[in-house]
Each structure stands twice: as C-alpha cells, then as structure tokens.
C-alpha cells in the first residue's frame, strides 16, 4: 500500500513540475507568439542575408558589394523569396519548378531585370545549402538560416513557402507547397509584375 501511495505522489509531483515548466516556457515564448505568419498585404520584415556567394550573384541581385545585405537592397521591382528546408521532401520537389520559373524570367527581356529570386534555407547551414544548390542545380542565390532567425521573423511559415514581394516590401502573393502548374504560376508572376508598373 505504501508503494502505491508513493507512486501516486510521484506522478502528481511530475505533473505539477511539467505544468510549471510548460507555463514558464509559454511565458518565454510570449513575444514569439505575437509574430504573425506572413500573409498577403503584410510588409516583409527586415532581415540580413549573408554576402552573395560570388560576384555573379552580387551582379544578379544588383548589390554594390560582396557584403551581408537586406532584401530591400536587391535591385528589383519584384522579389520572389523561397523559404525551404534542406530535409523537406516537398521542398525538393519544388526545386525544379523554381529553376524553371527562373529560366522563364531570364529568357524574358521585359522581366529579367525587374524580377529577382532568392532562397532561404530555414534551419540550413551553409554546407547543406551549398549541397542543395549543387544537387538541384539552383541558378539563383540561396542563403542559410541555421538559427531559423529569418524563418521566425516570417512567423514560422510551413515550407516550401513562396513569397512574391514588391521592392517596398509589400507581400503580394504567398504560396505554400509544391507548385503544380509551372506555366500558370509564371503567368501569375508576370501579371503581378505588369500590374506593379
């Protein structure tokens, strides 16, 4: 009988401790909970990206120097920002879609200077991002976010998440998941670009 009472007391104590830890954790996350997930009409928060990986990436983004930069320094009217995870199978499927979108944009003289693409690897370290870029033949700049700082500023969106943003930071479109119809998606991007002019 004593063992039974001791066991009940032990479990009751564990419940109280866990509840207390959960309450402290919830209080600590109060500020993080206030960050809304990015949505159409919102303004993209400022965040810093690593220096471009090469002078060709620097030139593509229209940056003056090979130094860390903010999205607001990118020389474009529209920025396509892809948030992905290096271990995400859906993100891997989205890779070829984005490569095709990039090619469509670069092949269109009316769009190639006005629309730029970048990717941010939520939780991804530079080495894994480099491997991703090589394996999937990604032609546009990718940036690591090993501490998920950028991802958290964006409100922890599910991945893959494609944002279409104006150069002033207004979010015009948000797409979650793999894009099923690449041609239609490109037409939408082109229309968004033309509507911004």
Per-range role (PLM):
Residues 2-11:
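Bacterial N-terminal signal peptides that target proteins for export
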Residues 164-197:
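Thiol-/selenol-based redox modules, centered on thioredoxin-like
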Residues 10-20:
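Bacterial N-terminal signal peptides
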Residues 21-61:
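N-proximal helix/coil linker or "cap" segments that precede and/or mark the start of modular domains
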Residues 80-81, 117:
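Hydrophobic beta-strand anchors of alpha/beta hydrolase catalytic cores
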Residues 49-79:
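A short beta-strand-turn-helix
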Residues 75, 83-100:
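Conserved redox-active cysteine motifs that mediate thiol-disulfide chemistry
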Residues 118, 130-165:
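Short, internal strand/loop/helix patches
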């Amino acid at each position: 009988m004593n063992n039974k009472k001791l066991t009940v007391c032990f479990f009751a104590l564990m419940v109280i401790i866990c509840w207390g830890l959960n309450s402290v954790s919830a209080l600590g996350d109060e500020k993080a909970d206030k960050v809304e997930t990015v949505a159409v009409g919102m303004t993209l928060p400022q965040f810093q990206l690593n220096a471009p990986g090469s002078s060709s990436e620097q030139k593509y983004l229209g940056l003056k120097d090979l130094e860390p930069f903010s999205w607001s320094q990118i020389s474009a009217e529209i920025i396509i920002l892809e948030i992905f995870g290096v271990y995400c199978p859906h993100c891997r499927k989205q890779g070829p879609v984005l490569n095709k979108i990039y090619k469509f944009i670069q092949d269109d003289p009316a769009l190639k200077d006005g629309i730029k693409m970048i990717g941010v690897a939520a939780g991804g370290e530079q080495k894994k991002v480099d491997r991703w870029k090589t394996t999937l033949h990604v032609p546009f700049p990718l940036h690591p976010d090993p501490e998920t700082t950028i991802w958290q500023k964006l409100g922890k969106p599910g991945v893959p998440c494609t944002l279409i943003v104006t150069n002033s930071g207004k979010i015009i479109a948000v797409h979650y998941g793999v894009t099923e119809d690449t041609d239609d998606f490109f037409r939408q991007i082109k229309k968004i670009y033309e509507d911004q002019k």
